[in-house]
C-alpha cells in the first residue's frame, strides 16, 4: 500500500488521506504512509480524515487526525537529539522562540558554551517558548527542558562538565574531550580567582594545568581525535584501537580531572 501511494504522489504534493471506510488497521497504515510520503516525496500532509457514524445522534462527525503527525515530529526530534545531541532539531517545532534554541545548538556544537548558554537562557525566559495551541509541545515540554538543563549550572566549569558528560554518553568523543579540557581550565581559573571569561587568564590556567598528567593526556587524545595526529603515547594509541577502549579512557580522564560521576556498573 505504501508503495502504491508513493507511485501516485509527486514530489512536493499536498496529500489528504481518508481512512473512514476500510479495515480497522487502515488508520495505522495511513499514519505510516503519511510519514513515508513526507520523507520519500517531500509531500505535505494536508489532513488525515476519519468520519464515524453515531447512531445515537444520527450524525457522522468527521475528524482530522493530522495532529498525530505533530506527535511523530516530536518523537523523531527527541530520537535525533538523543543520537547526536543537536537540540536544534526542536527549533522548527517551537515557532518564533525556536530560533533561539537553534542558535544555542549552533554555538554549543561549535564549542562556544558561553554563547550557547546565553541563547538558551534567553529561550528559557520566554513565555512563548512553547506554542500554547500545540498540545504535542506541552506533551514533550518536560523532556526538552530536561535535555537542555545544563545552562542552569551555577558556573562555567559546572556547565562545561555537564556538556562533557553528555557528549561522552552520546558517543561524540571529540566534543567530550574539548568540553572536558575547557571545564578543567575553567575550574582552575575559578580556583585561582581569575576571570574565567578572560582569554589571557584562561591561557594562564591552561599553563598551570600542564603539570597534570591527566590534562596532558586528555589534550593529546583530543588532538589525535580532532586532527588525526599520530599519538606518541601508547595509552592513547590503545584507546584509539576500538570504541570501548576510547570511551573508557575518556571516562577515566574526565573522572580524574572533573570528578565525573561514574554510573553504576561502569
How would you describe each model-predicted region?
Residues 19-32:
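Gly/Ser/Thr-rich loops at beta-strand to alpha-helix junctions
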Amino acid at each position: 500500500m505504501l508503495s502504491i501511494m508513493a507511485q501516485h504522489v509527486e514530489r512536493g504534493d499536498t496529500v489528504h488521506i481518508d481512512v473512514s471506510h476500510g479495515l480497522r488497521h487502515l488508520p495505522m497504515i495511513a499514519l505510516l504512509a503519511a510519514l513515508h510520503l513526507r520523507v520519500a516525496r517531500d509531500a505535505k500532509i494536508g489532513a488525515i480524515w476519519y468520519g464515524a457514524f453515531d447512531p445515537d445522534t444520527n450524525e457522522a462527525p468527521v475528524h482530522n487526525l493530522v495532529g498525530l503527525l505533530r506527535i511523530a515530529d516530536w518523537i523523531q526530534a527527541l530520537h535525533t537529539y538523543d543520537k547526536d545531541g543537536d537540540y536544534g532539531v526542536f527549533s522548527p517545532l517551537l515557532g518564533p522562540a525556536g530560533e533561539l534554541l537553534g542558535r544555542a545548538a549552533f554555538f554549543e556544537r561549535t564549542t562556544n558554551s558561553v554563547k550557547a548558554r546565553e541563547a538558551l537562557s534567553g529561550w528559557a525566559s520566554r513565555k512563548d517558548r512553547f506554542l500554547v495551541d500545540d498540545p504535542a509541545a506541552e506533551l514533550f515540554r518536560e523532556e526538552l527542558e530536561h535535555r537542555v538543563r545544563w545552562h542552569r549550572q551555577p558556573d562555567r566549569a559546572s556547565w562545561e562538565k555537564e556538556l562533557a558528560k553528555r557528549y561522552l554518553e552520546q558517543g561524540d568523543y571529540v566534543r567530550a574531550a574539548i568540553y572536558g579540557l575547557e571545564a578543567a581550565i575553567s575550574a582552575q581559573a575559578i580556583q585561582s580567582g581569575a576571570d574565567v571569561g578572560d582569554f589571557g587568564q584562561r591561557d594562564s590556567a591552561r599553563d598551570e594545568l600542564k603539570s597534570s598528567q591527566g590534562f596532558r593526556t586528555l589534550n593529546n587524545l583530543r588532538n589525535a581525535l580532532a586532527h588525526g595526529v599520530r599519538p606518541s603515547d601508547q595509552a592513547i594509541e590503545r584507546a584509539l584501537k576500538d570504541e570501548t577502549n576510547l570511551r573508557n579512557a575518556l571516562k577515566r580522564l574526565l573522572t580524574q580531572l572533573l570528578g565525573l560521576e561514574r554510573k553504576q556498573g561502569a
